[in-house]
Amino acid sequence: MKLILGSASPRRLELLAKLNINPSEVVSPNIDESIKSNELPLQYCKRIAHEKLKHFQNKYKDSVILTADTIAYTGRKLIDKTDDENIAYKNLLRLSGKRHRVSTSICIRNLENRIFKKTVTTVVSFKVLSSQDIEDYMKTNDWQGVAGSYKIQGMAESFIKSLNGSYSNVVGLPLFEVKNLLISAGYK
């Protein structure tokens, strides 16, 4: 049975490999990921994951399709992905000494065209970051293009005081839930 991973994230591919799942194809969905006016972070996350799936609606009929979207946020404020060093620095300052949430919405379409969805949230607490912590981290370039402007699987792991929930969710794909959704969808 074929699996299509609808994602540009190399981390999702690495995480699926931990489940011994190797997608037949990895395709980046080309969709507008702009946040809508008054859209809350979780609504946004669910909508984007579903729109990624809709992008493949009439393609890959002989395959199971998996899409996902991961966000970081504090309260109602999304901490978006960025390639701008100044914005990333400000994002890390905003996370310093505080709790935030990382949510991933998963959508799977099976061969019968049924859609399976799940959203997983992990609460992450950062230590108080010194300007030196942030400057050192910025040199790694791990902040580029990732939710919250940090990759937990790198140097940023040393910023984490506590984590309540799925570690792999913060990386980009909650493995427990993905495995169970794939089973429910009939993926073998």
Located regions from the model:
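Glycine-centered loop/turn motif at secondary-structure junctions
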Residues: N20-P23, G186
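Anionic-ligand binding patches
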Residues: L3-I4, L40-K188
